[in-house]
Amino acid sequence: MSNDVKLKVYLETSFVSYLTGGVTLNAKIAADQAYTRIWWERERSEVEVFISGYTLAECEEGNATRAAERLGAIKDVPLLPDRSDEVVLLARKLIDGHALPEGETTDALHIAAAAVNGMDVLLTWNCKHMANPHTLPKTRQIIASSGFFCPAIMTPKTFIENTEMEVSHV
């Protein structure tokens, strides 16, 4: 997948949590963690990876040991510039336009941060509010009508599968 121009990929907090998550008996979560780690090892060097202050703040929360693991994993990932006025305004539009529910401000802020900063892809395991095929059309419409490009919002699994399809068709 080596091109002259690298994709700009935004990492939402669930990505970081799955990357550093401990052993689980939940088979689905274990599989998702495995996809996340595969993406991190195989795809990260092929793209430009970014986080926002929202990702950083959420990674600092919770159990101190787990927080340290999350922060350690992203310590070298560039932080997007603070464009908070634009991000907050777009996030509000996403909620007011019913692309995301009223109580999901942080999810809206992640999407808005990625859009305002010109990301190509937003990686997340949040399929309820973010990587949801039922809400994505509304999200795209609101972002486009606000003058921004909507990043492809997907799971690491989808990213890997799409990359494998791209390579197999070459």
Question: Locations of the language-model features?
Answer:
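Short, well-structured N-terminal submotif of metal-dependent ribonuclease cores
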Residues: 1-51, 60-71, 96-102, 136-139, ...
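A residue-level structural signature of the nucleotidyltransferase/glycosyltransferase Rossmann-like core
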Residues: 8, 48, 122, 151-152
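C-terminal end-helix/capping segment
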Residues: 131-152
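C-terminal interaction segment
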Residues: 146-170
